[in-house]
Amino acid sequence: MGGEAGCAAAVGAEGRVKSLGLVFEDERKGCYSSGETVAGHVLLEASEPVALRALRLEAQGRATAAWGPSTCPRASASTAALAVFSEVEYLNVRLSLREPPAGEGIILLQPGKHEFPFRFQLPSEPLVTSFTGKYGSIQYCVRAVLERPKVPDQSVKRELQVVSHVDVNTPALLTPVLKTQEKMVGCWFFTSGPVSLSAKIERKGYCNGEAIPIYAEIENCSSRLIVPKAAIFQTQTYLASGKTKTIRHMVANVRGNHIASGSTDTWNGKTLKIPPVTPSILDCCIIRVDYSLAVYIHIPGAKKLMLELPLVIGTIPYNGFGSRNSSIASQFSMDMSWLTLTLPEQPEAPPNYADVVSEEEFSRHIPPYPQPPNCEGEVCCPVFACIQEFRFQPPPLYSEVDPHPSDVEESQPVSFIL
């Protein structure tokens, strides 16, 4: 973890503890993965002799999804029952760093600086990638707690970034994706002709910073002037108490040239670069982060013609061979810029006269997911690890729009599993 070490000022009754801090062994390490060792020191500085009962270290990790009245500080007891909440635990470690000998109640630390080393191993089972969203989060932290007689406990906490690696070199993510669709422009007997669209990407899995080559063929047999466009969309889905919340937003886009009536256009690898975004999260039973590449055509006075191609944002880059020994790729250094950067909203270019007609909203749909196994009280088994360079850098600075604003849809039980 980069950055300054965690530090907490003393609040003891006599001010004997000047500071309590926590540092990791490798402060430059951006993130941790399943099975790795976390090591460091707890630092304590005392100005006078300090009596303590124990010094312990706690490491915790959990996913939570919640919304409703009780998530607001001003919620009353009568409205608290309306809130929805779900939680899944992934990490729970507790270590004793210092405790009194058997038969003794306290330890006396002499004035000065003290260091207490710690070391523990993360579970070998896949951990879900760290993430923070509007209706939930997946967070891991390490906390040192100093227990003292007659005064409140003192503690210091550090956040631990975790990534569940997704290798885009797996066969499923190397498969090309192709879709075709046609739309008749006009209505009833006043049709002006069809508009057809075919779009293809060479593989399903990409990583942050990669440029996706888009291959498309557009034929305009209508009387309208049309505009082809492409965009990457992120969809966050939260599940709590059998209800769902979904947020969908554009994270990158590109636009093509106008296509006149009776003309065609071809994209021979038109590129769309993936900005720093959190990797796909597909192995958590209460929070899911999906991506799709939409290739669509704006038709004045009509609904868009749109193709959505599934996309997985991974963490282990494409090696060009689809090698079976893809574990070697995990040794590659990753661009972790999404841990700190905020992604600006990327507006489309100013509209021309063909765009003046107001565009209807994209149809929003979440594929139905069958009911997953019961996750209460146990770690969810990862279904399909797919992920690259990330922390949820807080999701990009986009305009958050909840596509399900009413409570009606929330009452429908929905679950997801790959």
Curated annotation (Swiss-Prot):
<keyword id="KW-0967">Endosome</keyword>
<feature type="short sequence motif" description="PPxY motif 1">
    <location>
        <begin position="350"/>
        <end position="353"/>
    </location>
</feature>
<dbReference type="Pfam" id="PF00339">
    <property type="entry name" value="Arrestin_N"/>
</dbReference>
<protein>
    <recommendedName>
        <fullName>Arrestin domain-containing protein 4</fullName>
    </recommendedName>
</protein>
<dbReference type="GO" id="GO:1990756">
    <property type="term" value="F:ubiquitin-like ligase-substrate adaptor activity"/>
</dbReference>
<comment type="similarity">
    <text>Belongs to the arrestin family.</text>
</comment>
<comment type="function">
    <text>Functions as an adapter recruiting ubiquitin-protein ligases to their specific substrates. Plays a role in endocytosis of activated G protein-coupled receptors (GPCRs). Through an ubiquitination-dependent mechanism also plays a role in the incorporation of SLC11A2 into extracellular vesicles. May play a role in glucose uptake. Participates in innate immune response by promoting IFIH1/MDA5 activation through interaction with TRIM65.</text>
</comment>
<keyword id="KW-0677">Repeat</keyword>
<dbReference type="GO" id="GO:0070534">
    <property type="term" value="P:protein K63-linked ubiquitination"/>
</dbReference>
<dbReference type="InterPro" id="IPR014756">
    <property type="entry name" value="Ig_E-set"/>
</dbReference>
<dbReference type="GO" id="GO:1903561">
    <property type="term" value="C:extracellular vesicle"/>
</dbReference>
<dbReference type="GO" id="GO:0005769">
    <property type="term" value="C:early endosome"/>
</dbReference>
<dbReference type="GO" id="GO:0043231">
    <property type="term" value="C:intracellular membrane-bounded organelle"/>
</dbReference>
<dbReference type="GO" id="GO:0005768">
    <property type="term" value="C:endosome"/>
</dbReference>
<keyword id="KW-0968">Cytoplasmic vesicle</keyword>
<comment type="subunit">
    <text>Interacts with ADRB2. Interacts (via PPxY motifs) with ITCH, NEDD4L and WWP2. Interacts with AVPR2. Identified in a complex containing at least ARRDC4, AVPR2 and HGS. Interacts with SLC11A2; controls the incorporation of SLC11A2 into extracellular vesicles through an ubiquitination-dependent mechanism. Interacts with TRIM65.</text>
</comment>
<dbReference type="GO" id="GO:0005737">
    <property type="term" value="C:cytoplasm"/>
</dbReference>
<dbReference type="GO" id="GO:0140112">
    <property type="term" value="P:extracellular vesicle biogenesis"/>
</dbReference>
<feature type="short sequence motif" description="PPxY motif 2">
    <location>
        <begin position="395"/>
        <end position="398"/>
    </location>
</feature>
<dbReference type="InterPro" id="IPR011022">
    <property type="entry name" value="Arrestin_C-like"/>
</dbReference>
<dbReference type="GO" id="GO:0032728">
    <property type="term" value="P:positive regulation of interferon-beta production"/>
</dbReference>
<keyword id="KW-0472">Membrane</keyword>
<dbReference type="GO" id="GO:0005886">
    <property type="term" value="C:plasma membrane"/>
</dbReference>
<keyword id="KW-1003">Cell membrane</keyword>
<dbReference type="GO" id="GO:0016567">
    <property type="term" value="P:protein ubiquitination"/>
</dbReference>
<dbReference type="Pfam" id="PF02752">
    <property type="entry name" value="Arrestin_C"/>
</dbReference>
<dbReference type="GO" id="GO:0051443">
    <property type="term" value="P:positive regulation of ubiquitin-protein transferase activity"/>
</dbReference>
<dbReference type="InterPro" id="IPR050357">
    <property type="entry name" value="Arrestin_domain-protein"/>
</dbReference>
<dbReference type="InterPro" id="IPR011021">
    <property type="entry name" value="Arrestin-like_N"/>
</dbReference>
<dbReference type="InterPro" id="IPR014752">
    <property type="entry name" value="Arrestin-like_C"/>
</dbReference>
<dbReference type="GO" id="GO:0015031">
    <property type="term" value="P:protein transport"/>
</dbReference>
